[in-house]
Amino acid sequence: MSGIQLHDVKKIYPNGFQALHGIDLSIQEGEFMVFVGPSGCAKSTLLRMIAGLESISEGEIVIQNRCVNQVLPKDREVAMVFQNYALYPHMTVYKNMAFSLSGKMPREEIDRRVREAAENLEISHLLERKPGQLSGGQCQRVALGRAIVRRPRVFLFDEPLSNLDAKLRVSMRLQLINLHQQLKAEGLPSTMIYVTHDQVEAMTMGDRICVLDRGVIQQVDKPVTLYHQPANKFVAAFIGSPAMNLHDVTITTNNGQPALSFDDAGKLVLPASVAARLNGYTEAQICLGIRPEHVLITTADAPGALPATVQTVEHMGNEEIVHCDVAGRHFVARFPSSLGWASQPGERIGLQLALDHAHLFDITHGRVLRPASL
């Protein structure tokens, strides 16, 4: 099998601290895989182990059907792009891009590769400049070009855009996506692994996303699946902005129908399709998850609504994000500005939860509860 396979990969430091716990992951040839997670989740450590910059304690890393545990970084056919660019300040852009090829192929081939990559990255006019004369975005494109000319089997990116301003990050993000598509279209090696803590980057760039927490894979899936079908409470909370509303509630009944109690805020009856997920669940409480776009604002006395008080309203231009207090619980609602709803902090309103879209999580372990058919 081509691509990259990680088999029970562990990282244990001499002091006994275990950073990675039995990582099993298969990355397909030509796939754009994103590693995402909070600071300290070991996503960069895992990337550096694939690159050969960090030793492996246990397990096996396979690249293109070859175990590379004992293979030097320069012989793994990977190219890494770092956050800090790592350019030689005394060399021109041209020489920075050509440096890794010097002495390995004819000058004509080196020149062709450098100029071709520079044209694709729109930096041909910068080839005779030095890094000190470039902007951050230009430096990052040079670093990317330096990786491209090597024609590696795998591109590794370690938070390469985090030093750039917001507008430039968007531009570079699109450029990386286009580069990946272009390499695939030309039949060139295009497997990419991208590390970020920014979930927007993860959701917009990755074919699949690997979510990590404390050195353990929480879920590997397509972006849309992670958003709509999180495997556990951690993924539900981490993916999505604003974050999913998560609240521990008591399982009860209301007129004989399964319901959830929000203590002083009242009860909400569960739709039959959602209530079916509780079959076999024996705990008295459960964690309810609901996305902000599935929290609907209505009047304070509306039937089936939770009484709430507006705390803060974020006017985003195209949408409104409303933070509310519901008997001591924090809820966030999100809706288009075109609806014309306006309110002030302190106003009493009602929140209707679209429970058909609810997620239910085990109160003890945080695992999602799914219907028996799933």
PLM features per residue range, with description:
Residues 242-244, 254-374:
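Non-catalytic connector elements of ABC transporters
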Residues 77, 87-234:
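ABC ATPase nucleotide-binding domains
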Residues 54-62:
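Conserved post-Walker A/P-loop segment of ABC ATPase nucleotide-binding domains
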Residues 51:
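Helix-to-loop junction immediately C-terminal to a conserved catalytic motif
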Residues 44-47, 142:
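ABC ATPase nucleotide-binding domain helices that frame the ATP-binding cleft
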Residues 60, 66-67, 216:
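ATP-binding/catalytic-site motifs of ATP-hydrolyzing domains
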Residues 36-38:
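The feature captures the beta-strand-to-loop junction immediately N-terminal to the Walker
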